[in-house]
């Protein structure tokens, strides 16, 4: 993994995180509409190189800045802090990474900043990103398989709206919450016509988390609650997906998902 920031000047910063893997992570699927909509895997996307982050930031004011590109989606505790030094186990927290994409990164635009001082200090992020793809939802991993990136292009038909707020007023303490909303996950499907008769299929995710660190102790806790509308209708469609697609056919898909955990 190669991660870096390049500062053009005091206002413009380029950030990137690039992965080099021998497994050909840059392969992608495409749909051959001239062959009855068959799925085919292609390697033109990049072979062994994959981008986890690649964005340009315009620094305007401590309380308001703008970033655009391929961004980490700050929903939950682990996505923002997915490096191994940020959890005690040998793998990422299972509850969070089972029901949400991890690491979750999408194309989009973000505004962020810090405001307040002393005991009233906060930071925030607000993003519009490519929404989750309903084709990838299933029984075992809920919406984790809906992250964009399987295909050569991402679908931005129904974007995801993300907001996060962190309280930073006490040294060593961080209390945060985030919200995700996509109005119609079915519209982001690679075959959206299969969901049209069910109308909009909205998804809402709420999270709360806490971290405390000093030289003697480190403690973390988080909770996630998600609600997927029309889960029964979605299950009936996903249960009949093509066997050649990159998706599973494991249904039924849960209407609600909950995860919580902590470590000290």
Annotate the PLM regions.
Residues 1-134, 157-162, 166-174, 255-256, ...:
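Outer membrane beta-barrel
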Residues 134-188:
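Loop-centered beta-sheet repeat module
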């Amino acid at each position: 993994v190669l991660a870096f920031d390049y500062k053009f000047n005091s206002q413009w910063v380029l950030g990137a995180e690039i992965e080099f893997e021998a497994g050909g992570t840059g392969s992608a699927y495409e749909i051959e509409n001239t062959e009855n909509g068959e799925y085919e895997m292609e390697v033109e996307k990049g072979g062994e190189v994959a981008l986890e982050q690649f964005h340009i930031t315009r620094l305007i004011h401590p309380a308001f800045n703008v970033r655009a590109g391929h961004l980490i989606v700050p929903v939950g505790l682990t996505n923002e802090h997915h490096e191994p030094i940020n959890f005690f186990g040998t793998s990422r927290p299972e509850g969070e990474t089972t029901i949400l994409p991890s690491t979750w990164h999408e194309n989009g635009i973000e505004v962020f900043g810090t405001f307040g001082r002393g005991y009233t200090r906060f930071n925030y992020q607000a993003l519009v990103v490519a929404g989750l793809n309903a084709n990838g939802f299933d029984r075992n991993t809920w919406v984790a398989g809906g992250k964009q990136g399987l295909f050569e292009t991402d679908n931005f038909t129904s974007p995801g709206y993300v907001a996060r707020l962190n309280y930073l007023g006490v040294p060593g303490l961080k209390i945060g919450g985030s919200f995700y909303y996509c109005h119609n996950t079915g519209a982001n499907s690679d075959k959206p016509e299969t969901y049209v008769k069910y109308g909009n299929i909205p998804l809402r995710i709420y999270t709360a988390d806490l971290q405390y660190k000093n030289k003697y102790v480190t403690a973390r806790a988080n909770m996630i609650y998600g609600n997927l509308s029309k889960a029964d209708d979605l299950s009936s469609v996903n249960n009949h997906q093509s066997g050649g697609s990159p998706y599973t056919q494991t249904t039924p898909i849960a209407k609600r998902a909950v995860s919580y955990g902590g470590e000290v």
